Structures are given as C-alpha cells and as structure tokens.
Amino acid sequence: MPSRSLPLLFGAALCAAALSGCVIISNVDEDKLPAAWKSEINPPAPRPPQGRFASAGLIARGAKPPVEGRLEWMFLPGQIRDRTPAETIELATAPDGTFTARAWRGGRVVAEVELPGRLDPKTGWLELERIPVKSTNKFGVTVATQSARVAVGSNGALYVQMSSTEAGVVLFLPAFGTGTVWGRWESAKP
C-alpha cells in the first residue's frame, strides 16, 4: 500500500469507526504506573538500552495490576510467526542512536530489526519512531504504527513506553484504536 494512502485510510477508518462505535482509546500515563516502577525510572540509568533481557515481562495497561507481556511485542510485532515465543531479546544501541533488537530462541536468532533512534540528552531515554508492524489480524485488514521510548531503570531492568495506533476493517466493520502502555523486563542472566 503506498505510503500516501495511509493517512487517508486512517482518516476514513476513524470517521467510520466513530459513526459505528468501534473506537478504542487506552492510555497509561506515568502517574498510573506501580510505585516501584516510578522510582526506578526517575531518573533512568545513564547507559543506553543494551544487553539481553528476558522476553517475558510485565505490561501496565491502566489501573489494573500489570499483566504478562512479551518484549518482542514492543520491537518485533508480528515478526515471530510461530506460537513459540523468544527466550531473550538482545538490544544494542549505537552512538548515533541506531537501535538493534534480536529475538533469541534455542541458541539462534529468530527475528531481528534495526531502527533509527534518538537519545534524549535530558532524560536518557532512547526514542524510536515508525517501528514496523506486521499485521497478525486474521479477521480483517488493518494498518498500524508504533513508537517507543526505551530506558534502563536504576535497578538494571528495561522499561518501555510504547504508543500505537491501528485502523482498518475488522469483521466488515471499520475500527480504530490508539493506546499507550508501559512494560518492564528483567535483565537476562548470561
């Protein structure tokens, strides 16, 4: 699909979704995070996000307690097609901000992505825009965009603030959704 038609699809889906009632908006602000998470990310550790982290972690989606979440959902959405998740995700950040994420399972790389990033000198967070999303929706056609802020907390855990927008047609109905979630993943033991 040509990139110039993406804004038209988003606009059409948003208008149709608003008329039909298929709109989902969910945002988690920093003030809604668990207290322990807040103390670990303010300020984040001065080192860029790199190293190996467990693929299984926690995602905060609002007032409810955090739920299990996979790190590959943040940087490699839809790229691991089989049902067996990655064991660890290896992250590397180059001095120019280029960010690489590799999903490891059984001693081999099963998915990899390289993204342009920008290190915010004031906060220490790495900002990533336009994370490629491969649709796994079996019930319709959707277009999604995803961006993230990444930092290592004072305890060595990885924190990700991910924002996404998705629009399209699902089960013959126009749909639109947007949201922001936070995730936390422990450093993997070598």
Indicate where each model-derived feature is located.
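Sec-dependent bacterial lipoprotein signal peptides
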Residues: 1-22
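Generic low-complexity segments that are intrinsically disordered, proline-rich and/or Lys/Arg-biased
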Residues: 3, 8, 35, 45-49, ...
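Amphipathic/hydrophobic helical signal segments and adjacent flexible N-terminal regions
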Residues: 3, 20-86, 145, 154-157, ...
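Short intrinsically disordered, low-complexity segments
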Residues: 16-21, 30, 105-107, 115-116
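Contiguous, well-ordered beta-strand patches that form the walls/edges
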Residues: 85-153, 189
